[in-house]
Swiss-Prot record:
Gene Ontology CC annotations of this record: pi-body
Gene designation: ASZ1
Entries under Pfam families matching the protein: Ank, Ank_2, SAM_2
Chain intervals for the UniProt region annotation (Disordered): 1-22
Phosphoserine modified-residue sites: 17-18, 20
Major place of residence: cytoplasm
Subunit and interaction comment: Interacts with DDX4, PIWIL1, RANBP9 and TDRD1.
Protein name in UniProt: Ankyrin repeat, SAM and basic leucine zipper domain-containing protein 1
Residue stretches making up the SAM domain: 272-334
GO BP annotation list: cell differentiation; male meiotic nuclear division; regulatory ncRNA-mediated gene silencing; spermatogenesis; transposable element silencing
Organism: Colobus guereza (Mantled guereza)
Amino acid sequence: MAAGALRGLPVAGGGESSESEDDCWEIGYLDRTSQKLKGLLPIEEKKEKFKKAMTIGDVSLIQELLDSGISVDSTFQYGWTPLMYAASVANAELVRVLLDSGANASFEKDKQTILITACSARGSEEQILKCVELLLSRNADPNVACRRLMTPIMYAARDGHTQVVALLVAHGAEVNTQDENGYTALTWAARQGHKNIVLKLLELGANKMLQTKDGKMPSEIAKRNKHHEIFNLLSFTLNPLEGKLQQLTKEDTICKILTTDSDREKDHIFSSYTAFGDLEVFLHGIGLEHLTDLLKERDITLRHLLTMREDEFTKNGITSEDQQKILATLKELQVEEIQFGELSEEIKLEISGDEFLNFLLKLNKQCGHLITAVQNIITELPVNSQKITLEWASPRNFTSVCEELVNNVEDLSEEVCKLKDVIQKLQNERENDPTHIQLREEVSTWNSRILKRTAITVCGFGFLLFICKLTFQRK
């Protein structure tokens, strides 16, 4: 009896009989036929070896222990299974071994699924993508949410894994699901500043108008987190990318998502009109039509072109001369945002007349750009709704935004009138001050003229927006 007990104790590696297959792993039991050893000590020892093998990622030892009878769904600390642990470290080879041994890909602990664990893993995107692909191939549900109502695609978007996001959508993940705070995958990507994720989600049909529980859209979230490039991208009126992949089959979508750049150049599966019609118009309008084929080959849309940085221009083969043309055109088209955080430092009592005049001129120029932009939109809008080619959301969305614009313009007009009254009051006081040396009449007349032009411009802009609003309501 004592001898039997001694035979069951762990021994040093290499001390087993020659028949043992576990010499190098120090499994340490000799009598495999003993029911007592099978029921008690060997199983506990195997579990301990299994945990250590999982920790160091020893796939061959894990496979050996699984073959010896260790349960593939045995639980570790916090109730995690081996598969969940392997997914958390993005060990694709280990995930494959465990799945092939029958591990449950749909296991969850406290509303934490293995797929969510894989999507939020710390590792290379290549390894995470392989893990996610393996789990999806074993029917892991991509729409099961955690306790915070976050789904796998939200975690992937938050962490910047573009290919993982696309793969999840190809397997049925809902793009516009919202978590407990009203965040979508697009909102998370905008918050974290992942431009490529934002572009991909728009292409996959993400709704950029969905608001969080505190009433913020993805563009506003991006702006609040100082991701101005993404803010401009999401604020762009046209959206040729939206829903671009929604009509494809699952197989075609996966093929499109996972092909290399060279494959995309060889096999471009989308309609050039749908993806590049507006781009061609833009390029022809500024005399750069020779760039059309180049941008098509690289799958660059107008939205992407308008948000490119200088290094991206060079990387995509756009010459310095062409870059200057594009940037010059954008400077004319875009309304430069006034940094009001800086105005508090500029508008002081010591401000010179020239500086204040420059501020008013800049404000007037901004209003002029806005008026031109609205005029262009009005002339470009089709009179008949049947002539609208691109996919449009409900006109009610546009009408509500126009109403808000009209209100903002009215507020701006009111504030400009207040500014004019304050300046007029200061001017009258100075004219009545006997100690003040009068300026030349020409300067006074010029300042008054600038104020009048500013007020007229703002009122004119409000009138144009009112006309635009009526146009949408008529439609």
